[in-house]
Design a protein with these regions (language model features):
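Conserved SAM-binding strand-loop segment of SAM-dependent methyltransferases
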Residues: 138-152
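A short, conserved alpha-helix within the catalytic core of class I
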Residues: 172-183
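Conserved alpha-helix/loop element of class I SAM-dependent methyltransferases that forms part
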Residues: 72-89
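C-terminal alpha-helical "lid/dimerization" subdomain adjacent to the S-adenosyl-L-methionine
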Residues: 196-237, 243-251
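Class I SAM-dependent methyltransferase Rossmann-like catalytic core
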Residues: 56-76
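Conserved SAM-binding loop of SAM-dependent methyltransferases across substrates and taxa
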Residues: 99-111
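A conserved beta-strand element that flanks and buttresses the S-adenosyl-L-methionine
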Residues: 164
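Conserved SAM/SAH-binding beta-strand->alpha-helix loop
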Residues: 121-123
Length: 266
């Protein structure tokens, strides 16, 4: 009986050591992958896998499900495409920044020297602020600020090289969507860019599955903005469409735009 128990304990101990070894190998691999990204020139492109490696190292605190969403966001959203469009060493306002994943990745990739993220969710901002503390040791010269603020209460003062509005408008009531869009545009400095992405409203089955996603995670019935409407709002505001892309990840459809503010307003 004693020999049997001893053998059982030894098997459990060996299994625990193997699991610990795999965890250490996985962690070291993630650290090395992220360090490779940090060491690259800012002009170098990143992959979706790079986004996952960065997220796993930066977002290590908070609820397990929240960490899971951050670690795997790159599987359903073209974050690397957004990063590729942002110039090196810019300052950015991220409206509806959530947990700060985009700002974190831009910072590690050398695309951001100063970032201000705002979101109406205090829990999301708490996660972003925790990430900012970790980023401070990785990229010490970056200035990051995350603030809990409702869009209806107004945006931070000042102008920025880049203003990002990513997956926000479909959460805004239809009667306030155009105002929120144009208000964010007012924070783009002359010659700067307005980086916009939202979920597609067609085909119907992609739009429907996107809607089910938000019903499950945000408990919200979302309201799509046709990309044609966003293009019209931007051009009426004096911006030009510099980049127009459509992307799919799994069943998720994404419409991406870069709207450029002229150096000299008409």
């Amino acid at each position: 009986m004693i020999a049997t128990e001893r053998a059982s304990h030894e098997r459990h101990a060996r299994a625990s050591r193997r699991i610990s070894a795999r965890v250490r190998v996985t962690t070291l691999a993630s650290i090395r992958a992220m360090q490779e990204v940090v060491d690259r020139p800012a002009s170098t492109s990143v992959t979706a896998a790079d986004i996952g490696a960065m997220a796993r190292q930066v977002f290590r605190d908070g609820p397990a499900f929240t960490r899971f969403l951050q670690h795997h966001r790159h599987r359903i959203a073209p974050i690397e495409r957004l990063i590729a469009l942002v110039p090196p060493r810019c300052d950015i306002l991220d409206v509806g920044c959530g947990g700060g994943l985009l700002v974190a990745c831009l910072t590690i990739c050398g695309r951001v020297r100063r970032a201000h993220g705002v979101d109406s969710s205090s829990a999301a901002i708490a996660n972003a602020q925790a990430a900012a503390k970790r980023l401070a040791s990785m990229v010490p010269d970056a200035e990051l600020l995350f603030e809990c603020r409702d869009v209806e209460a107004g945006l931070p003062e000042g102008e920025f090289d880049v203003v990002a509005l990513i997956d926000v408008l479909h959460h805004v009531p239809p009667t306030a969507q155009k105002q929120a869009f144009l208000q964010a545009m007012t924070r783009v400095r002359r010659g700067g860019m307005f980086l916009y992405k939202d979920m597609c409203d067609a085909p119907w089955w992609r739009a429907g599955l996107n809607r089910m996603h938000d019903l499950a995670l945000a408990q919200q019935w979302i309201h799509y903005v046709p990309i044609e409407a966003a293009d019209q709002w931007a051009t009426e505001a004096g911006f030009r469409i510099e980049c127009a892309q459509s992307h799919t990840r799994l069943w998720y459809g994404h419409e991406l735009r870069v709207y450029r503010r002229p150096l000299h307003d008409a």
